[in-house]
Swiss-Prot record:
Entry function: Nucleoside triphosphate pyrophosphatase that hydrolyzes dTTP and UTP. May have a dual role in cell division arrest and in preventing the incorporation of modified nucleotides into cellular nucleic acids.
Reactions accelerated catalytically: dTTP + H2O = dTMP + diphosphate + H(+); UTP + H2O = UMP + diphosphate + H(+)
Gene3D superfamilies reported in the protein's UniProt record: 3.90.950.10
Key word Cytoplasm present: yes
Organism: Alcanivorax borkumensis (strain ATCC 700651 / DSM 11573 / NCIMB 13689 / SK2)
Main location as per UniProt: cytoplasm
GO CC aspect terms: cytoplasm
Cofactor needs: a divalent metal cation
Source organism, top-level taxon: Bacteria
Enzyme class: hydrolase
UniProt keyword annotation of Transcription regulation present: no
Protein name listed in UniProt: dTTP/UTP pyrophosphatase
Length: 193
């Protein structure tokens, strides 16, 4: 069965490649990513992953399974998405500096008229940083397309003091849950040519 990745994220593609899953990338789905009133962060992220997979399913050129995913950074009850600009990125990182926050990642697989969603919640502790140091990081541009304005797998790893949970979930695709869903949909991994 063909697996389609409904995402423009190079990090998600890299994580699927890491577990040797053959897949084809579909264009990133365009959906309304506005949280609903009183929607819990976990419910929001799961809904986004499901909606991305369903939009991807409608765009499949041939029958197969579609994987959609979403990640959000949550500080208290505030969902921090991708920054609109460097000013917003600096504001987000300033909020996160020296604090503990959650990174919620969800993955959905739609296959043969069925769908299943799994998620992870990872606690990330940031080191405290002065504004000048955060400005240097923002200027690298690394966090511009990332929830919470940082990339743990790159330069942003220096912002992190510790984490408890799924490292791959913080990157953008929780591999344990992804493998569970691939098995559920009978999609092989570890396909080394």
């Amino acid at each position: 069965m063909i697996l389609y990745l409904a995402s423009g994220s190079p990090r998600r593609a890299e994580l699927l490649q890491q577990i040797a899953v053959p897949f084809t990338v579909l264009p990133a789905p365009s959906i309304d990513e506005t949280p609903r009133s009183a929607e819990a962060a976990v419910d929001y992220v799961r809904r986004m992953a499901r909606e991305k997979a369903l939009v991807g399913q409608a765009r499949m050129p041939t029958p197969g399974a579609v994987l959609g995913a979403d990640t959000a950074v949550v500080l208290g009850d505030q969902i921090l998405g991708k920054p609109a600009d460097d000013t917003e990125a600096l504001a987000m990182l300033t909020q996160l500096s020296g604090t503990s926050h959650q990174v919620i990642s969800a993955v959905c697989v739609c296959s043969e008229g069925r769908q299943a969603v799994r998620h992870t919640v990872t606690t990330v502790q940031f080191r405290p940083f002065e504004a000048a140091r955060l400005e240097v990081y923002v200027a690298t541009g690394e966090g511009r397309d990332k929830a919470g304005s940082y990339g743990i797998q790159g330069l942003g790893g220096a912002l992190v003091e510790s984490l408890s949970g799924s490292y791959s979930g913080v990157v953008g695709l929780p591999l344990e849950q992804t493998v569970e869903l691939l098995e559920w949909a009978d999609i092989p991994y570890w396909q080394i040519d």
